[in-house]
Structure formats: C-alpha cells, structure tokens
Amino acid sequence: MKLGYFLSSEEWGPRELVDQARRAEQAGFHALWISDHYHPWNDEQGHSPFVWSTIGGIAEATNMRVTTGVTCPTVRIHPAVIAHAAATSAVITQGRFQLGVGSGEALNEHVIGARWPEAEERLEMLEEAVEILRLLWQGGVKSHRGRHYRVENARIYDLPEQPPEIIVSGFGPKAIKLAAKIGDGHATTSPDADLIKLYRDQGGKGPVQAGTKVCFSRDEAEARKTAHRIWPNEQLPGELAQVLPTPAHFEQASELVSEDMVAETVPCGPDLDRHVETLEEYANAGVDELFVQQIGPEQDLFFDSWAPEIVPRYNSD
C-alpha cells in the first residue's frame, strides 16, 4: 500500500492547500487527494475554495499526482463543464491528474436550487455523466442526448495525451458495482474488506484508493478536542451526509456526536504506533493507496514527524 496526503478544502484556503501539497511532496508522500466542495461540513472548518483553481496552483508548486476526492459531475456543474475542467487539469499537471467522482451531497449540490434526487437516480446520473466525460475526451465535436443531460456540438480543444483516469467512489453495494463497471479505480473512506472484495468480484481492476483522517499532536487530550471540534460530522450515520443541505444542519446533527465517538475512529495524539495501526487496517482490507488528512493546525509537526517515521514504511521503493 502506498501512502498519500489528503488535502482538505473544507479546512484550509487555497494558498495553505498549495503549501501543504509542497510539504507533502518534501515528506515523501506518494500522491495527493483534494476534496471538492462548495460548502464545508460546518462553519468551524471554515473554508471551501474552488478546487479547479487550487489544482492549478498545486501543479506549479509540485510534481505530484492529484486526484479529486471526489467531484460530483451531476447537479451543480454539468458534466460537460467537468470534462473541460478535468482535461485542463490533466494538461497543466502533465498527466498527473485523476478525476475522482461520486454521486454527491445535497450540502454542495442544492445551491443552484435544483431538486435533490434519490440515491438510485443519482447513481444513474453519475453513470451518464461519466459517459459524457469519456465522450468529450475523445476529441472532436460531440453531442449527447440522454435521459438526464444534453450536450450540443461541444469540443474540448486542450486535451491531455491520455484521458484522465476516473476513480469512482461508493459506500454501498450498488455504488461499488457501478464503480467496477464504469471506473478506472474505486475510492472509499472505509477499510471494509468485504466491499473491496465486491469491487474486485464485479470486475473492478483498477486501484482501490481510500481517505482517512488523523490528528497527530504531542497532547492526546488536545488532539481529541481538536478532532471533535472540527470533524464531528464524520460520525453521522446512514444517509445524513448525503441529504442534509447546509452546514447549519450538520452542526445541529453533530451535537449528538461525542468526543469519545470521534476518538474511536480518528487516531489522536503522539503515539505513532496507534496511527500505524489505523493505516494497517486499510492495508489489510485491500486498499492500494491510502490518503491521510491531518486534522487541525499542527501541520508542520505532522509532516516533520511522519516523514522519517511512517512514510518510508510505505513509500520506500
């Protein structure tokens, strides 16, 4: 398993994200994930820059591969526009770009006032959107008339030498089967060996990528407080992450999440062995590339500590 760094667009502004990308490269991380949001999950996180602009900055600051973790190409932004943005990102990174896609959350997609579809319809829309992406990346003038989208005489003039790989996220059986069908890889946030096996059994041959969060700090008690203050939404059950429409709603729901609940799944504090245990859960589940996000302000401490102690265990070759 390779170890990458997960850039949190919800927690940092664009200049800080570019700086973290630079630090991640210096520390030996394999590649980058970057989240694509219109809103953060709560006001405490406090950021949400336009990911496509940030990717341009990262491309100039580093030589790392960047994957959106993940983009919704179905509601807020038409898939023809995502195809254009992704093609430009692949050109400016000289091919070091992957487009991670998923069926999205109302938190980000409701802002244009469109109806928020049910889960099954969202997957149907995602499948058609990926069809449009691949069509436009073929080059030339293209049109598409489908159930959910129309494209009229569209041509992307600046195309990379090879189309970007599409990494499809999914957390349930239907989404994972779709990922195996239409994707060049699969993205998840859970070290669930059964679901990863399902992806493989359904014919998924590309890499399984995953994202996880840690709060590395010299003070475990302070790290627990930081993780709970900034990311309580990670513990919300069921489909709440997909259907709650605003940061205020997430803040209300997160009042039910205790500090202990967050600390059960987010390793907090200075114990490197505890952090490695979490990483190994993903490796043992069959994850090929794991992207780690450091929660909170102690970014320098994280990179300085992980670069010599943890990163070489995974990225030495």
Model-derived features: positions:
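Active-site-adjacent structural elements that line small-molecule/cofactor binding pockets in enzymes
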Residues: 1-317
